[in-house]
Amino acid sequence: MRVRVDLNISLDGFATSEGSTPESPMGPDWERLTGAYVATRTFRRRVFGDESGAGTVGVDDAYAARYFEGIGAEVMGAGMFGLHHFPDDPEWRGWWGDAPPFHYPVIVLTHRRTGDLDFSDGTSFHFRDLSARDALDVARDLAKGADVRVGGGPSTVRQFLLEGLVDSLHVAIAPIILGRGVNLWSGLRDVTRDFTVHSEVAESGTVHVTWSRDSIL
């Protein structure tokens, strides 16, 4: 079992931009950050249900396919689920509505909501007020030997990195400069010093960098 992170960031390290609204939950620059990933054949099939074979193939698609492999549970922050915008709506089921793309248990770190939310496709959201380490213990039990993903946002990922809980950190660096937002690397000087590193440039210009605690990338 490994703890994995996969994030899209800009050249200057921003994983989300300012100006988040209920209509644009990830901010106005989200499409620029994730455009290469969303365009892949794997993403279109796994998230949009597009079985036509449309979408890009190549390096970006290989990483998109790897993103979905071997995950048994996930941990995410309240903002990624949408609770910052809908804190008092008991009917809020996340940005994905009735068709979340996870198909495994997800721990949502929050003090705003409790209980569980189950879907017929195997996705379940478990709302818990926990530290990073305690959340990981719960996720490990739910993953049943498979890997655990720390899904985001960047503030949540930083907590896990600062506590040394991440085994594999993959960032897809989009060839754009945002100059604002939430920076993944804030306060993380030398956090990857004990990792090996692998990098690869995709046809889109996206640079995929993976830091790993062992030789498995």
Write out the residue ranges for each language-model feature.
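Enzymes that bind and transform nitrogen-containing heteroaromatic metabolites
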Residues: 1-217
